[in-house]
Amino acid sequence: MAKEVAGLIKLQIKGGAANPSPPVGPALGSKGINIMEFCKQFNARTQDKAGKILPVIITYYADKSFDFVIKTPPVAIQLLELAKIKSGSAEPNRKKVAEITWEQVRTIAQDKMVDLNCFTIESAMTMVAGTARSMGIAVKGEFPGNN
């Protein structure tokens, strides 16, 4: 018989750096989840992604047990790392802070394909390019899907 799901918690935590302090502790403690057990499991599964911000979806059950799924880093974070900038533009339509190529957009789209709500790499690329535009990052060249 399946366990009764009590709820979901969505967090963004640095890989290999989960600890009981906020935001992890209060979010899990208020639901009665063993905070230290989650931190140990999360840190063990994300050792190879240390320092990267990772979205995690925690499913907790009525018996206070839990499961969690680790997603790929958000597109915005990947774009900031790729462009080597700390933040996007305050005025993205007027002031561009960096440039990337369509090949770099394709790389991010392929990485995020499992988490995005699309079926083709071209549609994933347009989503990534839209995020880049909204951050003030220009995409150089012609969209490769316009052949």
UniProtKB/Swiss-Prot annotation:
PTM text: One or more lysine residues are methylated.
CDD domains associated with the record: Ribosomal_L11 (cd00349)
Keyword Protein biosynthesis: no
Alphabetized Pfam families for the sequence: Ribosomal_L11, Ribosomal_L11_N
Disulphide bridges, residue numbers: none
Homology family: Belongs to the universal ribosomal protein uL11 family.
Stored NCBIfam families: L11_bact
PANTHER family: 60S RIBOSOMAL PROTEIN L12, LARGE RIBOSOMAL SUBUNIT PROTEIN UL11M
Quaternary structure, from the entry: Part of the ribosomal stalk of the 50S ribosomal subunit. Interacts with L10 and the large rRNA to form the base of the stalk. L10 forms an elongated spine to which L12 dimers bind in a sequential fashion forming a multimeric L10(L12)X complex.
Protein purpose: Forms part of the ribosomal stalk which helps the ribosome interact with GTP-bound translation factors.
Name assigned to this protein: Large ribosomal subunit protein uL11
Organism: Phocaeicola vulgatus (strain ATCC 8482 / DSM 1447 / JCM 5826 / CCUG 4940 / NBRC 14291 / NCTC 11154)
Gene coding for it: rplK
